[in-house]
């Protein structure tokens, strides 16, 4: 524990609150970083359940002289949410909507509510909260208020300051005060400390009015320092959508204060009508400078947003599976810069009219798809809502896309959101690029061209002192450049550690003295997030860096291939460090990632939380042998290896693969318990068990047997185990070699252990369907063992990597003669067949492994390209389709839809679900059964329950089918079975 903060002290606090309190190294480590370059180990972590928990904690901190740090999503890029303090995480419990008034268009929310969650609630009422930040899927309203966040549509709606109308906050003495419009307050100086503070600060603002007006930048996007200008008479009149007579809103002093003045417990928000129609025009430019110069003309068309994307971001996005189709759909040629221009008027005709004017404007500036290559450019229209959403999502992921560079040098946030007036934007960006050139680096540019606030991050290696010195010099010169143009050194992301020291440069010493009066008036004991805005450390203090001097990782021996990343442990270090802490894995809707976090809301159970624990463990910051510790095992325990992060994390953090590596280390050290052995060695004893199915099925027939298996074997008694089948699939049912038949296409049908012994009807149906499609399915036998071939999935899942490697090599050698002839391999179980394209190539060093990787297909992938010979029955039916997590991770759900759409009259509804929660043995484990069911209850079970009982459910994963049957007693079938029943033979 840190000096002066004992476990006994925190235990005392724990007894006086209902909060969850942690002070172990793993938890503290997970909260030691945000999305900035900094790392500060907190004293402990407190997760409050009630407002009284916070009051008690503030009183405790004041008396014990321990700092406090309020935290939401932890996505700050400037170091606002790291400190040597007790971190209070609002996001798990304090996330409710307290009041909503549709007519007045206001709502009151707790600080931990996520922006996207709020807007999902508001959507049916045709309202939204319009401060649409790029991290909206995990950013909390409390964090956004503390930061004075802005978002891409601030040209129309303004910043948080312009959309917050009240804050209830707890002050340093534990008292509560409602900060709202001054006209609603009766400032009796004897009525608590707040009125006295406010009265004094109102006088301070009025006394220094000329200094404030002279020193505060005139740009819309200014979030540096304290908003003392909000206390000037009629301050709101100068804000977007403000008018004379709006007066002073006291809450605006707390907005942007970064949790340094008080602790917000609720925020009152001004809502806006949800745009009924939207349309987008993507302007292409042959140079970055020309795009910047055009922005000032485009905003005259009154768009809702003008967002920049540069060629570096486009190049990186093309290499990310999730974004590649979007880039290909909307980008014409090879532009150096794009401006994404969005119109959102109530009338679609008006939107189309403005889009035409945009075409005319770009044409009048000399850009054309024909003629002079120096002026090659124009506008690509994006009309469909679906494609607009994909483009917006790509832009929102700008930071993560930039951070996907697989090298030690990364784009670094420290001058990333300076704001200048539009007329100066081209000159300012040109000047900053010259500074980058001077220090032999380059910046990646994107974001808010409409308001002169572009995001740019020079590429530097924060592990090298030379690059840290470059960062210092660039920051110094950039601050002077911004000051030259009368801009703001921070136009969106705030001060934190990285910019607080520059407030004196930007505002002057007298204004800093005023800021200090504000801080000490509210927080005389300096317990609220000290060292931010005023009295901050130097931004280049390397002892505060995530990669501090002396940082290094253990060069452990790894089994999997991590060679495309830099660093120790064969690149394992670099793969872990790809996590930039931006927290996309904390999203609660859309896609799959991260199913465990969606259920528990614990940072430990997010991909980010696990990656941080791995980084700290590998670098020795969590003690010796932390990688194989019980704490690391607990950290990984709820990871279901869904592979969603492999696809959905923009920086490509593959936690499923990392878990395999760590599991291998632990298994080598401690071995497996009986439960784990029964799972891992299933392929070894399955052929024996299949001879006595009645015996092995007794567990679910004899009263009390399931409970005994729970106690002694670890299998939950709350669900039955899969039934061993006496009619299991035998290899003799398929030819074991390729027969000459020129009218049929040969294909190896890989029969996995699960399908073979528990659902053989799927294999038999697949054979029928493949033959109907013109294929000749066969299964080569192995000369090395009488036991059927196996993909090694159960061994992988339990850390027996060497055993899995042996199985993979045996499979490769058996299939290799046919693979060399171009014969494809097809499988029915997604987690098995897709391991041929994922885990096995990372495990097996044989160069021939690429033949297996590139020629292995799921059942539907194979059929989607060769299904025309099949004569399907005409149907008048609706089916529900649930995609297996691994199918989603490899974009292999679309082929199922393509095949099903060949059946006339069939309506296919793809269920929007995350993970089913079964995850192989995960749902059978007594320790994880409850979490397994909760995962399914998030989306899967409700979606199915809404349909008629006779509706066909198609799910290719055996785990998915078992979960659906066990959880809500509905039958689901494999695609092969469904097709087999609906083919005219």
Where are these regions (language model features)?
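N-terminal flexible segment immediately upstream of the FAD-binding catalytic core
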Residues: 1-63, 73-105, 134, 157, ...
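Ferredoxin-type iron-sulfur electron-transfer modules and their immediate structural context
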Residues: 10, 408-409, 484-489, 496-638, ...
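N-terminal glycine-rich flavin-associated loop
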Residues: 13, 36-68, 90-133, 145, ...
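A glycine-rich phosphate-binding loop feature that marks nucleotide/adenosyl-phosphate handling sites
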Residues: 27, 76-79, 135-142, 220-231, ...
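C-terminal substrate-binding/cap subdomain adjacent to the FAD-binding core in PCMH-type
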Residues: 36, 146, 154-160, 164-393, ...
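Flexible inter-domain linker/hinge segments
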Residues: 117, 189-239, 243-246, 522-595, ...
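Terminal amphipathic helices with adjacent charged low-complexity linkers/tails
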Residues: 267-272, 292-295, 300-409, 443, ...
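Iron-sulfur cluster-binding electron-transfer modules in prokaryotic oxidoreductases
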Residues: 523, 530, 656-985
């Amino acid at each position: 524990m840190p000096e002066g903060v004992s476990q006994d002290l925190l235990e005392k606090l724990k007894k006086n609150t209902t909060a969850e309190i942690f002070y172990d190294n793993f938890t503290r480590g997970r909260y030691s970083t945000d999305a900035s370059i900094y790392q500060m180990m907190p004293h402990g972590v407190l997760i409050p359940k009630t407002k009284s928990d916070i009051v008690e904690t503030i009183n405790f901190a004041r008396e014990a002289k321990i700092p406090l740090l309020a935290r939401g999503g932890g996505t700050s890029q400037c170091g606002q949410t790291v400190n040597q303090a007790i971190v209070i995480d609002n996001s798990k419990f304090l996330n409710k909507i307290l009041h909503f008034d549709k007519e007045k268009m206001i709502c009151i929310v707790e600080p931990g509510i996520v922006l996207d969650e709020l807007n999902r609630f508001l959507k049916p009422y045709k309202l939204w909260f319009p401060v649409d930040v790029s991290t909206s899927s995990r950013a909390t309203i409390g964090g956004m208020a503390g930061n004075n966040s802005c978002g891409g549509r601030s040209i129309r709606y303004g910043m948080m300051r312009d959309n917050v109308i009240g804050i209830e906050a707890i002050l340093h003495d534990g008292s509560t005060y409602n900060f709202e419009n001054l006209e609603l307050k009766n400032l009796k100086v004897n009525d608590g400390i707040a009125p006295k503070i406010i009265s004094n600060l109102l006088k301070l603002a009025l006394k220094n009015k000329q200094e404030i007006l002279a020193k505060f930048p005139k740009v819309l996007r200014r979030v540096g320092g304290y908003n003392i200008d909000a206390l000037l008479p009629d301050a709101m009149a100068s804000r977007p959508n403000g008018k004379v007579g709006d007066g002073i809103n006291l809450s605006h002093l707390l907005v942007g204060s970064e949790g340094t003045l008080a602790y917000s417990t609720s925020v009152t928000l001004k809502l806006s009508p949800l745009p009924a129609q939207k349309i987008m025009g993507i302007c292409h430019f042959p140079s970055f400078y020309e795009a910047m110069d055009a922005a000032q003309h485009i905003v005259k068309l009154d768009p809702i947003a003008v967002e920049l994307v540069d060629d570096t971001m486009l190049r990186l996005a093309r290499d990310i599976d999730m974004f590649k189709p979007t880039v290909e759909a909307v980008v014409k040629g090879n532009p150096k810069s794009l401006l994404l221009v969005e119109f959102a008027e109530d009338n679609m005709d008006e939107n189309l009219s403005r889009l035409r004017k945009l075409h005319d404007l770009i044409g009048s500036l000399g850009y054309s798809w024909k003629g002079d290559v120096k002026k090659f450019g124009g506008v690509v229209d994006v009309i469909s809502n679906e494609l607009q959403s994909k483009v917006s999502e790509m832009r929102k992921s700008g930071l993560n896309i930039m951070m996907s560079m697989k090298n030690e040098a990364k784009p670094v946030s420290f001058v990333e959101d300076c704001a200048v007036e539009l007329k100066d934007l081209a000159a300012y960006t040109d000047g900053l690029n010259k500074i980058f050139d001077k220090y032999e680096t380059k910046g990646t540019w994107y974001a808010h061209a409409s308001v002169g606030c572009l995001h740019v991050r020079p590429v530097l290696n924060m592990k090298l002192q030379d690059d840290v010195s470059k960062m210092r010099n660039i920051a110094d010169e950039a601050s002077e450049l911004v000051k030259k143009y009368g801009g703001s050194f921070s136009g969106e992301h705030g001060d934190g550690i990285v910019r607080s020291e520059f407030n004196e440069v930007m505002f002057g010493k007298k204004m800093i003295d005023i800021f200090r009066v504000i801080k000490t008036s509210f927080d005389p004991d300096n317990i609220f997030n000290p060292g931010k805005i005023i009295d901050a450390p130097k931004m280049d203090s390397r002892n505060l860096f995530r990669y501090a001097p002396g940082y290094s990782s253990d060069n452990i021996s790894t089994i999997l291939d991590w060679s495309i990343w830099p660093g120790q442990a064969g690149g394992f270090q670099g793969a872990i460090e790809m996590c930039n802490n931006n927290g996309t894995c904390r999203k609660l809707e859309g896609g799959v990632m991260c199913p465990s976090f969606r259920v528990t809301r614990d940072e430990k159970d997010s991909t980010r939380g696990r990656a941080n624990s791995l980084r700290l463990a590998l670098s020795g910051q969590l003690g010796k042998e932390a990688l194989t510790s019980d704490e690391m095992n607990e950290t990984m325990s709820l990871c279901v290896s869904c592979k969603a992060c492999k696809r959905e994390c923009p920086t490509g953090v593959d936690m499923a693969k990392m878990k395999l590596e760590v599991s291998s280390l632990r298994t080598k050290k401690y071995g497996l318990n009986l439960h784990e052995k029964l799972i891992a060695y299933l392929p070894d004893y399955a052929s024996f068990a299949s001879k006595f199915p009645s015996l092995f099925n007794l567990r679910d027939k004899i009263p009390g047997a399931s409970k005994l298996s729970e106690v002694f074997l670890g299998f939950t008694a709350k669900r039955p185990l899969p039934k061993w089948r006496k009619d299991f699939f035998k290899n003799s049912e398929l030819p074991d070699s390729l027969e000459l038949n020129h009218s049929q296409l040969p294909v190896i049908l890989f029969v996995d252990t699960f399908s073979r012994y528990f659902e053989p009807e799927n294999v038999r149906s697949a054979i029928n369907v493949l033959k109907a499609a013109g294929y000749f399915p066969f299964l080569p036998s192995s000369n090395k063992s009488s036991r059927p071939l196996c993909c090694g999935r159960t061994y992988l899942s339990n850390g027996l990597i060497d055993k899995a490697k042996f199985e993979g090599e045996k499979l490769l050698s058996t299939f290799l003669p046919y693979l060399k002839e171009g014969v494809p391999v097809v499988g029915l179980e997604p987690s098995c067949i897709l391991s041929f394209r994922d885990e096995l190539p990372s495990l097996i060093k044989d160069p021939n492994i690429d033949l297996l990787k590139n020629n292995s297909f799921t059942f539907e992938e194979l059929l989607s390209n060769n299904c025309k010979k099949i004569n399907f029955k005409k149907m008048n039916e609706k089916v529900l389709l649930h995609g297996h997590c691994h199918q989603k991770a490899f974009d292999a759900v679309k082929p199922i839809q393509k095949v099903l759409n060949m059946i006339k009259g069939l309506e296919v509804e793809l269920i929007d679900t995350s993970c089913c929660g079964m995850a192989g043995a995960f749902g059978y484990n007594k320790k994880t059964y409850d979490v397994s069911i909760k995962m399914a209850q998030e989306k899967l079970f409700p979606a199915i329950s809404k349909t008629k009982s006779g509706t066909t459910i198609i799910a290719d994963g055996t785990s998915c089918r078992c979960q659906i049957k066990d959880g809500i007693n509905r039958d689901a079938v494999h695609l092969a079975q469904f097709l087999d029943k609906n083919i005219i033979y």
